[in-house]
Amino acid sequence: MRNSLAILTLLSGFLLAQPSFTASDIVSNLAGASAVSAADMDGDGDIDIIAADEGGDAIHWLENDGNANPTFTIRAAYGNSDGPWAVVPYDIDLDGDLDIISASHVDNKIRVNVNNGAADPDFDDTVYDVVSGVDARGLDLGDIDNDGDIDVVVAGGGSNYVKWYENNGSQSFSAVNIDVGANNPRSVFLIDVDSDGDIDVLSANASDNEIAWYESNGASDPTFVQRTINNSVTGAMSVYAADMDNDGDIDILAAAQEEDKIYWFESDGAADPSFSATTITSSADGIYSVYAKDLDNDGDMDIMSASANDDKIAWYE
Protein backbone atom coordinates (compact mmCIF):
# COMPACT_ATOMS: atom_id res chain seq x y z
CA MET A 1 0.00 0.00 0.00
CA ARG A 2 2.79 2.39 0.90
CA ASN A 3 4.52 1.60 -2.40
CA SER A 4 1.27 2.29 -4.27
CA LEU A 5 0.89 5.64 -2.52
CA ALA A 6 4.49 6.53 -3.33
CA ILE A 7 3.95 5.71 -7.00
CA LEU A 8 0.75 7.76 -7.12
CA THR A 9 2.54 10.68 -5.49
CA LEU A 10 5.34 10.52 -8.04
CA LEU A 11 2.88 10.31 -10.93
CA SER A 12 0.89 13.23 -9.55
CA GLY A 13 4.02 15.34 -9.31
CA PHE A 14 5.01 14.39 -12.85
CA LEU A 15 1.61 15.34 -14.23
CA LEU A 16 1.63 18.65 -12.40
CA ALA A 17 5.03 19.41 -13.91
CA GLN A 18 3.80 18.79 -17.47
CA PRO A 19 1.69 21.76 -18.59
CA SER A 20 -0.56 21.41 -21.62
CA PHE A 21 -1.21 24.15 -24.18
CA THR A 22 -4.19 25.32 -26.25
CA ALA A 23 -3.42 27.06 -29.56
CA SER A 24 -5.08 30.21 -30.93
CA ASP A 25 -4.13 32.86 -33.49
CA ILE A 26 -3.21 36.39 -32.47
CA VAL A 27 -2.83 37.71 -36.04
CA SER A 28 -2.76 35.87 -39.36
CA ASN A 29 -2.00 38.60 -41.89
CA LEU A 30 1.72 39.35 -41.52
CA ALA A 31 3.67 38.93 -44.75
CA GLY A 32 6.01 36.14 -43.78
CA ALA A 33 5.95 36.41 -39.99
CA SER A 34 9.59 36.05 -38.99
CA ALA A 35 9.95 37.01 -35.31
CA VAL A 36 7.95 37.44 -32.12
CA SER A 37 8.71 38.69 -28.61
CA ALA A 38 6.65 40.13 -25.77
CA ALA A 39 6.87 42.74 -23.01
CA ASP A 40 4.85 45.59 -21.50
CA MET A 41 5.64 48.15 -24.19
CA ASP A 42 3.20 50.86 -23.03
CA GLY A 43 3.66 50.52 -19.26
CA ASP A 44 0.02 49.64 -18.53
CA GLY A 45 0.72 46.41 -16.65
CA ASP A 46 -0.06 43.81 -19.31
CA ILE A 47 2.11 42.02 -21.84
CA ASP A 48 2.12 43.31 -25.41
CA ILE A 49 3.66 41.66 -28.46
CA ILE A 50 6.36 42.74 -30.88
CA ALA A 51 6.43 41.01 -34.26
CA ALA A 52 8.39 41.21 -37.50
CA ASP A 53 7.34 40.26 -40.99
CA GLU A 54 10.24 39.68 -43.32
CA GLY A 55 8.11 39.93 -46.47
CA GLY A 56 6.85 43.39 -45.54
CA ASP A 57 10.16 44.62 -44.08
CA ALA A 58 8.18 45.79 -41.06
CA ILE A 59 8.21 45.62 -37.27
CA HIS A 60 4.89 45.85 -35.43
CA TRP A 61 3.77 46.24 -31.85
CA LEU A 62 0.46 44.72 -30.82
CA GLU A 63 -1.31 46.12 -27.78
CA ASN A 64 -2.86 43.79 -25.21
CA ASP A 65 -6.32 44.93 -24.04
CA GLY A 66 -5.57 43.55 -20.57
CA ASN A 67 -8.54 41.18 -20.34
CA ALA A 68 -8.33 37.73 -18.79
CA ASN A 69 -8.75 36.38 -22.33
CA PRO A 70 -6.79 39.11 -24.11
CA THR A 71 -7.04 40.34 -27.66
CA PHE A 72 -4.33 42.28 -29.45
CA THR A 73 -4.50 45.33 -31.71
CA ILE A 74 -1.73 46.25 -34.16
CA ARG A 75 -0.82 49.80 -33.19
CA ALA A 76 1.97 50.62 -35.61
CA ALA A 77 4.31 49.26 -38.23
CA TYR A 78 7.86 50.47 -38.69
CA GLY A 79 9.34 49.86 -42.10
CA ASN A 80 13.03 50.77 -42.05
CA SER A 81 14.28 47.23 -41.45
CA ASP A 82 15.39 45.32 -44.54
CA GLY A 83 14.56 41.68 -43.90
CA PRO A 84 13.90 41.77 -40.14
CA TRP A 85 14.64 38.42 -38.52
CA ALA A 86 14.74 39.10 -34.78
CA VAL A 87 13.13 41.58 -32.37
CA VAL A 88 14.04 42.15 -28.73
CA PRO A 89 12.42 44.52 -26.20
CA TYR A 90 15.04 46.32 -24.11
CA ASP A 91 15.49 49.69 -22.42
CA ILE A 92 18.59 50.52 -24.43
CA ASP A 93 18.69 54.21 -23.45
CA LEU A 94 17.91 53.58 -19.75
CA ASP A 95 15.00 56.04 -19.65
CA GLY A 96 12.53 53.66 -18.01
CA ASP A 97 10.61 52.41 -21.05
CA LEU A 98 11.22 49.57 -23.48
CA ASP A 99 12.69 50.15 -26.91
CA ILE A 100 12.74 47.70 -29.84
CA ILE A 101 16.05 46.24 -30.99
CA SER A 102 16.00 44.33 -34.27
CA ALA A 103 18.33 42.35 -36.52
CA SER A 104 17.81 42.53 -40.28
CA HIS A 105 19.71 40.14 -42.50
CA VAL A 106 19.37 41.80 -45.93
CA ASP A 107 21.13 45.03 -44.95
CA ASN A 108 23.14 43.27 -42.20
CA LYS A 109 22.28 45.71 -39.44
CA ILE A 110 21.21 45.79 -35.84
CA ARG A 111 18.94 48.73 -35.11
CA VAL A 112 17.00 50.42 -32.34
CA ASN A 113 13.53 51.95 -32.49
CA VAL A 114 13.38 54.26 -29.49
CA ASN A 115 10.21 54.42 -27.36
CA ASN A 116 9.03 58.00 -26.80
CA GLY A 117 7.58 57.01 -23.42
CA ALA A 118 3.99 58.10 -24.08
CA ALA A 119 0.97 56.19 -22.74
CA ASP A 120 0.26 55.31 -26.38
CA PRO A 121 3.91 55.07 -27.40
CA ASP A 122 5.52 55.70 -30.72
CA PHE A 123 8.83 54.11 -31.61
CA ASP A 124 11.15 56.53 -33.39
CA ASP A 125 11.40 55.41 -37.00
CA THR A 126 14.64 57.33 -37.44
CA VAL A 127 16.67 54.37 -36.31
CA TYR A 128 20.36 54.31 -35.61
CA ASP A 129 22.76 51.45 -36.06
CA VAL A 130 24.27 49.63 -33.10
CA VAL A 131 26.43 47.29 -35.16
CA SER A 132 26.72 47.29 -38.96
CA GLY A 133 28.19 44.80 -41.40
CA VAL A 134 27.01 41.71 -39.52
CA ASP A 135 25.10 38.81 -41.04
CA ALA A 136 22.39 39.34 -38.46
CA ARG A 137 19.85 36.52 -38.17
CA GLY A 138 19.41 36.59 -34.41
CA LEU A 139 20.40 38.71 -31.44
CA ASP A 140 20.00 39.17 -27.73
CA LEU A 141 21.26 41.65 -25.15
CA GLY A 142 22.68 41.27 -21.67
CA ASP A 143 25.70 41.95 -19.49
CA ILE A 144 27.81 39.01 -20.65
CA ASP A 145 31.00 40.06 -18.84
CA ASN A 146 29.29 41.43 -15.71
CA ASP A 147 30.89 44.86 -16.02
CA GLY A 148 27.69 46.85 -15.63
CA ASP A 149 26.90 47.65 -19.27
CA ILE A 150 24.88 45.93 -21.95
CA ASP A 151 26.55 43.73 -24.54
CA VAL A 152 25.07 42.23 -27.72
CA VAL A 153 25.24 38.64 -28.95
CA VAL A 154 24.59 37.88 -32.63
CA ALA A 155 23.83 34.77 -34.69
CA GLY A 156 25.72 35.14 -37.96
CA GLY A 157 23.51 33.01 -40.22
CA GLY A 158 25.23 32.11 -43.46
CA SER A 159 28.55 33.33 -42.07
CA ASN A 160 28.40 30.49 -39.52
CA TYR A 161 29.37 32.39 -36.39
CA VAL A 162 28.07 33.26 -32.96
CA LYS A 163 29.74 36.43 -31.64
CA TRP A 164 29.29 38.76 -28.75
CA TYR A 165 29.93 42.46 -29.07
CA GLU A 166 31.49 43.86 -25.93
CA ASN A 167 30.20 47.26 -24.90
CA ASN A 168 33.23 49.48 -24.38
CA GLY A 169 31.20 51.96 -22.35
CA SER A 170 31.39 54.69 -24.97
CA GLN A 171 28.66 53.58 -27.40
CA SER A 172 31.15 51.43 -29.28
CA PHE A 173 31.35 47.65 -29.44
CA SER A 174 34.18 45.17 -30.01
CA ALA A 175 33.49 41.77 -31.59
CA VAL A 176 34.51 38.62 -29.68
CA ASN A 177 34.10 35.15 -31.19
CA ILE A 178 32.11 32.51 -29.33
CA ASP A 179 31.87 29.98 -32.18
CA VAL A 180 33.14 30.49 -35.73
CA GLY A 181 32.03 27.00 -36.79
CA ALA A 182 28.33 27.20 -35.97
CA ASN A 183 26.31 25.65 -38.79
CA ASN A 184 23.97 28.40 -40.02
CA PRO A 185 22.91 29.84 -36.63
CA ARG A 186 19.55 31.61 -36.81
CA SER A 187 18.82 32.54 -33.20
CA VAL A 188 20.62 33.26 -29.92
CA PHE A 189 19.40 33.73 -26.36
CA LEU A 190 21.19 34.78 -23.17
CA ILE A 191 20.36 33.10 -19.86
CA ASP A 192 22.05 31.32 -16.96
CA VAL A 193 21.25 27.78 -18.10
CA ASP A 194 22.98 25.98 -15.23
CA SER A 195 22.21 28.48 -12.43
CA ASP A 196 25.87 29.08 -11.62
CA GLY A 197 25.59 32.87 -11.59
CA ASP A 198 26.90 33.77 -15.05
CA ILE A 199 25.32 34.34 -18.45
CA ASP A 200 25.41 31.47 -20.93
CA VAL A 201 24.49 31.58 -24.63
CA LEU A 202 21.99 29.39 -26.47
CA SER A 203 21.82 29.11 -30.26
CA ALA A 204 19.63 27.43 -32.86
CA ASN A 205 21.70 26.15 -35.79
CA ALA A 206 19.53 25.41 -38.81
CA SER A 207 21.83 23.37 -41.03
CA ASP A 208 22.79 20.75 -38.44
CA ASN A 209 19.46 20.82 -36.56
CA GLU A 210 21.20 21.71 -33.31
CA ILE A 211 20.21 23.59 -30.20
CA ALA A 212 23.59 24.48 -28.69
CA TRP A 213 24.52 25.75 -25.25
CA TYR A 214 27.71 27.78 -24.84
CA GLU A 215 28.56 27.57 -21.16
CA SER A 216 30.36 30.61 -19.75
CA ASN A 217 33.28 30.19 -17.37
CA GLY A 218 32.11 33.30 -15.51
CA ALA A 219 35.34 35.28 -15.96
CA SER A 220 35.45 39.03 -16.55
CA ASP A 221 36.72 38.11 -20.04
CA PRO A 222 34.56 35.01 -20.44
CA THR A 223 35.24 31.98 -22.58
CA PHE A 224 32.59 29.46 -23.57
CA VAL A 225 32.42 25.67 -23.85
CA GLN A 226 29.95 24.34 -26.41
CA ARG A 227 27.45 21.69 -25.36
CA THR A 228 24.57 20.17 -27.33
CA ILE A 229 21.04 20.32 -25.94
CA ASN A 230 19.59 18.43 -28.92
CA ASN A 231 20.67 17.79 -32.53
CA SER A 232 17.36 16.55 -33.96
CA VAL A 233 15.47 19.85 -34.28
CA THR A 234 15.04 19.76 -38.05
CA GLY A 235 15.67 23.22 -39.45
CA ALA A 236 16.33 24.78 -36.03
CA MET A 237 15.29 28.42 -36.37
CA SER A 238 14.73 29.79 -32.89
CA VAL A 239 15.58 29.19 -29.25
CA TYR A 240 14.19 30.67 -26.04
CA ALA A 241 14.52 29.71 -22.38
CA ALA A 242 12.40 30.13 -19.25
CA ASP A 243 11.09 28.09 -16.34
CA MET A 244 8.12 26.65 -18.20
CA ASP A 245 6.89 24.28 -15.48
CA ASN A 246 7.60 26.45 -12.44
CA ASP A 247 10.01 23.97 -10.88
CA GLY A 248 12.85 26.44 -10.39
CA ASP A 249 15.13 25.52 -13.29
CA ILE A 250 15.56 26.77 -16.84
CA ASP A 251 13.79 24.91 -19.64
CA ILE A 252 14.36 25.52 -23.34
CA LEU A 253 11.97 26.10 -26.25
CA ALA A 254 12.98 25.54 -29.86
CA ALA A 255 11.39 26.06 -33.27
CA ALA A 256 11.89 23.40 -35.96
CA GLN A 257 10.96 25.03 -39.27
CA GLU A 258 11.14 21.92 -41.43
CA GLU A 259 8.90 20.01 -39.01
CA ASP A 260 6.50 22.91 -38.22
CA LYS A 261 7.14 22.07 -34.57
CA ILE A 262 7.76 23.75 -31.25
CA TYR A 263 9.78 21.66 -28.83
CA TRP A 264 10.03 22.07 -25.08
CA PHE A 265 13.21 20.68 -23.55
CA GLU A 266 12.60 20.20 -19.84
CA SER A 267 15.62 20.57 -17.59
CA ASP A 268 16.27 17.98 -14.89
CA GLY A 269 17.57 20.76 -12.64
CA ALA A 270 21.03 19.27 -12.13
CA ALA A 271 24.18 21.38 -11.85
CA ASP A 272 25.12 19.95 -15.27
CA PRO A 273 21.57 19.72 -16.62
CA SER A 274 20.18 17.34 -19.21
CA PHE A 275 16.95 17.92 -21.09
CA SER A 276 13.91 15.84 -22.11
CA ALA A 277 11.98 16.73 -25.27
CA THR A 278 8.21 17.30 -25.54
CA THR A 279 6.39 18.50 -28.68
CA ILE A 280 4.10 21.49 -28.05
CA THR A 281 2.70 21.66 -31.60
CA SER A 282 3.40 20.27 -35.05
CA SER A 283 1.17 22.78 -36.87
CA ALA A 284 3.24 26.00 -36.91
CA ASP A 285 3.56 26.28 -40.69
CA GLY A 286 7.12 27.31 -41.49
CA ILE A 287 7.89 28.47 -37.95
CA TYR A 288 10.67 31.05 -37.61
CA SER A 289 10.44 32.17 -34.00
CA VAL A 290 9.32 31.06 -30.53
CA TYR A 291 8.96 33.05 -27.30
CA ALA A 292 7.33 32.67 -23.89
CA LYS A 293 5.59 35.05 -21.50
CA ASP A 294 2.49 35.07 -19.27
CA LEU A 295 0.19 36.80 -21.79
CA ASP A 296 -3.04 36.43 -19.83
CA ASN A 297 -1.60 37.11 -16.36
CA ASP A 298 -2.82 33.80 -14.94
CA GLY A 299 0.48 32.84 -13.35
CA ASP A 300 1.84 30.39 -15.93
CA MET A 301 4.00 30.70 -19.00
CA ASP A 302 2.36 30.92 -22.42
CA ILE A 303 4.17 30.35 -25.72
CA MET A 304 4.11 32.48 -28.86
CA SER A 305 5.26 31.61 -32.36
CA ALA A 306 5.84 33.41 -35.66
CA SER A 307 5.30 31.23 -38.72
CA ALA A 308 6.11 32.50 -42.20
CA ASN A 309 4.11 30.17 -44.43
CA ASP A 310 0.75 31.06 -42.88
CA ASP A 311 1.71 34.64 -41.86
CA LYS A 312 0.69 34.00 -38.24
CA ILE A 313 1.57 35.05 -34.75
CA ALA A 314 0.07 32.29 -32.62
CA TRP A 315 -0.43 31.87 -28.88
CA TYR A 316 -0.27 28.57 -27.01
CA GLU A 317 -2.01 29.06 -23.66
Segments and roles (model prediction):
Residues A33, G56, P84, A136, ...:
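Short coil/loop residues immediately preceding or within conserved phosphate-binding loops
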Residues S34-M41, W85-L94, R137-I144, R186-S195, ...:
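Beta-propeller blade termini
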Residues G45-I47, G96-L98, G148-I150, G197-I199, ...:
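Glycine-aliphatic tripeptides that mark coil-to-beta-strand junctions in extracellular
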Residues M1-Q18:
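Sec-dependent, cleavable N-terminal signal peptides
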Residues Q18-A31, E63-D82, V114-V134, E166-N183, ...:
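Blade-edge motifs of beta-propeller repeat domains
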Residues A58-L62, K109-N113, Y161-Y165, E210-Y214, ...:
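A short loop-to-beta-strand structural motif that recurs across blades of beta-propeller domains
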Residues I49-D53, I100-S104, V152-G156, V201-N205, ...:
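Hydrophobic beta-strand segments that make up the repeating blades of beta-propeller
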